[in-house]
Structure formats: structure tokens, C-alpha cells
Amino acid sequence: MIKLEGITKSFGSLQVLKGIDLEINKGEIVSIVGPSGAGKTTLLQIMGTLDEPDAGTVAIDGTVVSRMKEKELSAFRNKNIGFVFQFHQLLPEFTALENVMIPAFIAGVSSKEANERAMEILAFMGLTDRASHKPNELSGGEKQRVAVARALINHPAVILADEPSGSLDTHNKEDLHQLFFDLRDRLGQTFVIVTHDEGLAKITDRTVHMVDGTIKKD
């Protein structure tokens, strides 16, 4: 599903990633852990085509995305990869439903179909009655579930999450973590999650440990 080979990345004189090789299978939920500065977020951004490696290749479902032109890459990203961040990044002027629909509009989906897709996902999240509410009317846990719904709207094969539960309380963290597994079981998606949450890392299918820009071998 996801294959990284020889990934390097430097910012100025600082080498952040030092020849990363990593394969992630379809339907896996993989956590990436390690100390701050280990290169976790940079690796996730390269995996999600938000940044380019200095060297090496990134392939998703057999497509070598690291060789794509920007326009082609943007379309591929919007269709095949969903992103969830620590802070929900919902647009405050739009309702929960409208926020979820935005990536579908970008992909050229009709308003009717986007609405149907969004309502179906919000229903699965238990948020049907919150669809018309704006972000400032939602709880922290609800906002993050809306952000997950937005990541799912185009039925991506891969969900990449960077500290998705970092701003949530214990109860909402547990609910969000369970949601990832429910989604995987229902939709067969692949999840890669950067986290400092030991509880989440323990229940994922596999944990990748990073230290100083490398993957630590067990």
C-alpha cells in the first residue's frame, strides 16, 4: 500500500531524515513514535506528498507519487489521502456539514452527492444532529470527529494523522482511537498515526520507532 525507499530530507545543514525505508500494508493501523525532533512529522508530510524528499521514492498503492508533477499530485492527494491534524482546522464560517463537503467539491463531486456522502459519514460518527452547527458550537471531541469525517469524504485509501488526539481529554481520546479501528474494519482504510500517546501506540497493529531521523530496529 505505502512504500518508502531511501527517503532523505534536510533543512539547511540539519539532516532530518536519513535514508528511511518503510512499507505499510493495506488495512494496517501503524503508529509512528519517538522523541520530539526525531523526524516523525516530516516523514508523515513526505508520505502524504505535502513535502518532497531530497532523495528516495514514495509509492502509494503502486503509484510512485514522488515523480508526479504538482497539478497531478494535488489531484492524487485529494482523492487518495485523508489528513487529520492535532487541531481540527475547520473553517469557522461554515457548518460541520459544509466543512466535511469541501474536499468533495475540490474533487468535482456534485453538491447533491457531496451532501449525501457527508451526511452518511456524519451519521456514522454520531453527528447527524450537529451537521448544521458551526465549529464554535461544537465540543472539542465533536470538532475532531468532523475533521475525521472531512478526511473521509473522498473515500481515500490512506488516512495520515499527526497527533490527532493531542488536544483532547481522556474520554474523547479513547473515543477517537476506537473510531479509527471502527473505520478500518468498515472501510478497509490504512492509517498511519504520529503520536506521543502510549495508549494509542500500544493498540495499533504495528509501532514504528524513530530516533534521530532513522527507524530504530527492534
Curated annotation (Swiss-Prot):
Pfam families: ABC_tran (PF00005). ATP binds at residues 34-41. Residues 2-218 form the ABC transporter domain. One of its GO terms (molecular function) is ATP binding. Its EC number is 7.6.2.-. Keywords: ATP-binding, Cell inner membrane, Cell membrane, Membrane, Nucleotide-binding, Translocase, Transport. The complex is composed of two ATP-binding proteins (LolD) and two transmembrane proteins (LolC and LolE). PANTHER family: ABC TRANSPORTER ATP-BINDING PROTEIN MG467-RELATED, LIPOPROTEIN-RELEASING SYSTEM ATP-BINDING PROTEIN LOLD. This is Lipoprotein-releasing system ATP-binding protein LolD. It comes from Bacteroides thetaiotaomicron (strain ATCC 29148 / DSM 2079 / JCM 5827 / CCUG 10774 / NCTC 10582 / VPI-5482 / E50).
